[in-house]
Amino acid sequence: MGRIIGIDLGTTNSCVAILDGDTARVIENAEGDRTTPSIIAYTDDGEILVGQPAKRQSITNPKNTLYAIKRLIGRRYEDEEVQRDIKIMPFDIVRADNGDAWVDVKGRKLAAPQISAEVLKKMKKTAEDFLGEPVTEAVITVPAYFNDAQRQATKDAGRIAGLDVKRIINEPTAAAFAYGVNKVQGERKIAVYDLGGGTFDISIIEIDEMDGEKTFEVLSTNGDTHLGGEDFDNRLINYLVDEFKREQGIDLRKDQLALQRLKDSAEKAKIELSSAQQTEVNLPYITADATGPKHMNIKVTRSKLESLVEDLVKKTIEPLKTALKDAGLSVSQLDDIILVGGQTRMPMVQKAVADFFGKEPRKDVNPDEAVAMGAAIQGAVLAGEKHDVLLLDVTPLSLGIETMGSVMTTLIEKNTTIPTKKSQVFSTADDNQSAVTIHVLQGERKRATDNKSLGQFNLEGIRPAPRGLPQIEVTFDIDADGILHVSAKDKETGKEQNITIQASSGLSDDEIQRMVREAEANAAEDKKFEELVQARNHADALIHATRKQITEAGTALPADEKAKIDAAVKALEDALKSEDKATIEAKQQELMTASQKLMEIAQQQAQQHQHAHQGADAGADTAGGKAHDDVVDAEFEEVKDDKK
């Protein structure tokens, strides 16, 4: 078995790590950074950019630069959260044929897992470059409060990226791994408060140690899969837009270019206000009207930002209360509070957490890297490299089926340790019913329609009988990834129907395979593009060197030879404008052939230059030697100016 890497696929940033010896190690990407912006750009020439290169061009290409795609993964277009995002995102979120929220890029519909796969491919390549070997297996983290559809979609993204996803684990649990494996001894109860770019989770975890083996048992989890740093940014953006409109009378909401510049500046301002009391958003030429260009110059204080996001911070407190109640613990029974996610760097967030728990959160866990490091530890456990760690995670939401009267009947309660299996016997609602529809739901509400529909299937061939007589055994089986498998069996006939819940909004196997093929084709295109760029660079270098040699050769180069070389240079310059590597290389070869006489002259001149230097050096040695002989035994004596 090869190395299993750990990937934190974040809303704002992503990170990849491996276990190096006994310690998890974050791997730097090609740009030298330890985290990679989860930004994907589709350029006019067909190139796909990921990370910083995508972020750098976002201002000039806002409609085709995609970010916070994790907020769409596994979601329906009609979802309330998606409808909110449609109003604020610069790119086009559209309804797919299966009801999913997809993105339209240059007239092409892309699924959220397909887009996220580009980030995963970057993480995969980062690990491969570091390890010097192919990587095919990974542990990928998800928010603890992700539902079944979102977990499935994340696994699909891994498959599209060419990864066998060995395990999906919850982000707070992964962070607890990173903290607990080397930093603590004995039994401890911890709370992991995870406020990232797009999601919020709270998990209460018990770490127990016996005979050198550590057990991480998740006691409860709660959260909000649509609350994070992006929402904080949007509050600040809206404030800046309103202030600018008040001052200048221009509404920037209709200007995508201005909004993209504003998004970058708002994010920077928010980060600066974590360490400073005041900052300035200064954007020259943000827009223009009939009177000329307009500039934005707005001061923002920390207290102003805090007033804008106060309700968002408060929104994280209720899940804390629920998680503690579900775990059967009081605040005083917790030993440590761990902060995860970039948004927890905000002093207001840290104070809210400290006030609620009555103790300061620990500062020795890197909020941006802990999740990937924990995933790497889990990867090492699965690969058999690490044996002294056991993880007992939970399902975040209750699972059940719709029964008579549109009621959700729960089979597996939320916060049940996984993997788990539960069966229950149901019957028919009507006389002589020959088939039943099993409608699988996830959520905490009693009314079936108020919960998340995960999918449905039919069990047919039931022997006609009075209602209530047939016995249909429904079994729910949740695997270690938190993904649900359901079966229904007629106990009389033995007929059985099994499915892995493929949410009605999920990708089919055929669609995933198509996207895998497209990803592979893109990889081939990327390689082709890289080779074209290399050919162009070599050609540019050759043109530069040739022109320099022509200048140095001067009159030694016959006019007809110079004309021949000039023509070859022109032909190569024309070839550089094409997209054809073979043409560039052919014209490059022609220039080298045409420049043979020039190279001979350059060689002769170099030899003459060398001989001249050698002669000068020999003369200097002789003179130097004589001078040296004159002063070997002399005393130091000051030389007067008038004797010079």
UniProtKB/Swiss-Prot annotation:
Residues 601-644 are annotated as: Disordered. The keyword Glycoprotein does not apply. Pfam families: HSP70 (PF00012). Residues 602-625 have a biased composition (Low complexity). PANTHER family: HEAT SHOCK PROTEIN 70KDA. Acts as a chaperone. This is Chaperone protein DnaK. CDD domains: ASKHA_NBD_HSP70_DnaK-like. Residues 632-644 have a biased composition (Acidic residues). HAMAP family: DnaK. SUPFAM superfamilies: Actin-like ATPase domain, Heat shock protein 70kD (HSP70), peptide-binding domain. Keywords: ATP-binding, Chaperone, Nucleotide-binding, Phosphoprotein, Stress response. Belongs to the heat shock protein 70 family. The modification Phosphothreonine is found at residue 199. The gene is dnaK. One of its GO terms (molecular function) is ATP binding. It comes from the Bacteria. Induction: By stress conditions e.g. heat shock.
